[in-house]
Amino acid sequence: MGKLPMKEAALVYLDRSGGLQKFMDDCKYYNDSKQSYAVYRFSILINPCDVVELDAELGNHILHHPLKAAQVFQSVCFVAVKTLSLIGKLQTETQINIVLKLTHLPSLPSYSLDLCEFPLNYASQRFYMMQGIVIAMTTVTKYTQGARFLCSDEVCPFSKGFQYIRVHVPGATESATVRNDFLCRLCSSSLQEDRKFRVLGDKQIIEIITTKVLHAFQGDPKNQPFRFQSLSVFLRDELVNKMKIGNEYKIIGIPVCVKTSQTALCVEANSITPYTAKVPSGISDNFRCLLSLTSSSCWRFTAILANVFASHIVPLGTYNLLKLCLLMSLVQTRDCSSERENCLDILVITSDTLLVDRLLNFSMNLVSRGIRHPVCTEVFPTVSRDKYGTGAVSIQAGSALLARGGVCFIGDLTSHKKDKLEQLQSALESRSVTVFIPGKKFGDDFDQQMTFPIQCSFWSFVDMDSSSRRNVQKASTLIGQMDCSLIPANLAEAFGLLVNCKESSPCHPLLPTVQHTLKKAVDPKGPPYLASKQFTTEDFEKLLAFAKNLNVEFSLEAERMIHGYYLASRRIRTDSIHGSKLSANALKYLVSLSEAHARLNLRNKVLREDVLIAALLFEISLTLKYGATAFCVAPNALFPFELYDEDYLEQRDLYLTQCQQQLQHFIATCGPGTAVLSSDE
């Protein structure tokens, strides 16, 4: 088939798809403009499947020879402009710059570019689809979108007019569009650029990694060496600032080879689509059966979950308070496309850092964005000079932005320097981080600031019983208060939950831990308990993935109770000298805890029973920080008995019912008028 039938097919497609009408509207904009143009840029949306059905050869050109396909549409559009007199100032076909924007690519392996496979096909100059997470991006700079050249010989007919128009094509460098060694094809004289007709566009470079290499940031249990490489993606014009650090995208683009100090594979992006993870349709049969058996109580299902969770890491029934907090934090994570930001940050006070480290690392890996912060890198974004010599500033993600929508586990809090802890405190309080870009250092006249939202939960622990720290601990004068002098008080307050897992706490029974360790040493691969077979790690992954996507709303009773407890607690923990001890985010933490418990129960409505669990957890945390108050909560209030059978669950329900009555009495006694609340409160 020659070019004429393809041009006819292109015209038919434009007419059927509505592209012709959009093209005419764009032409009207150019024609009505008082500005003179050397290059007229048109973006045409292409559905490859529709084109292939209409004309197979044109579809093949679009998929495998996009530059030639653009020339076909360029010719069609030029004829349309001249025939319909759409742009009066247009003189030559080369003045039309056609950009084909693909909606998708066929779901075939040959159109997918896997960043983990070798070799990568970058010589074919055709479209591929790749998927990755943004780990770095540059500031926006300019590039030459199009330029007009004239022959330097005034006698030559090409010293006037628009015969020599150069436009950017995918994969081309700046020197391919504009330089001083072009020659006239008529008289061989040198060409000179007419600078007043130069067209500039926006350019941005981002770096992505494939999702498969996230295990490098999740703590490899086998301690095997690994290596991964990022891929640079060039965004131009309307695609600039369409991608956010930490988000995952599907990218259609053309791979090209760029030579800097060393040869690097890059991609010229054509279209970008945010990636949305599939939500599981349900939970495992074992959990469904357990949910049915415990439906008579609002507290039993989550109690059993915490009891059997991570049974191959810690003994069955131990660390239940911490495990419940971890599960609630995990269900408050969400996909990057979600607007929900109710994160739950956890700080663990422990004397067994090895076991707690293993438990937190295992829990973190149950969500897709669980990032263990490597010691050699930065938690928050950093800036450096762009390696491609564009003059732009490159902003590297850091662990916190990479964990977007998930969990950032930063290890032992005391291993971080003072300035980093101050930065962490600021991020926890404001849920954002600001990057300062000094103008002098990067060749700019002005300093810049860029602010990024922090959309992950932070987990950390503090070893309070190490030999180097025992001597500096001070005895507490308040009931229930724990000495946290090793970390700044404001930083401890910034964490939503403070969990005590020291030897003196109910979380830390010694004998079961010894028995569990011996059992694992004798049979490392075997499940240590029957519950480990019934509720596997995969079952918990599926449960969490389903629960975190539930949309929950507060019942009126739950809303009144949570506001009542907040006002009463704020009132009783306020003095005339220091003011209120509750942070500005206290109410947000209570709401998040209540929602988390409802989600973990697989419910769409937050009940008073959920608010009770939230209030108990929050009060235990406040007691560790400031000591007990009138609403005195025992450290083991959520798990007062060992959960051996149904009778113990019944006793726990009775105990929590008594706690609920105490909470209501506390609200009635200390809460100043909680029956009617304004929307602001």
Curated annotation (Swiss-Prot):
The modification Phosphoserine is found at S292. SMART domains: MCM (SM00350). GO terms for biological process: double-strand break repair involved in meiotic recombination; double-strand break repair via break-induced replication; late meiotic recombination nodule assembly; meiotic recombination nodule assembly; oogenesis; spermatogenesis; synaptonemal complex assembly. Keywords: DNA damage, DNA repair, Meiosis, Phosphoprotein. GO terms for molecular function: ATP binding; DNA binding. This is Minichromosome maintenance domain-containing protein 2. It holds the Pfam family MCM_lid. Residues 533-621 form the MCM domain. Plays an important role in meiotic recombination and associated DNA double-strand break repair. GO terms for cellular component: nucleus.
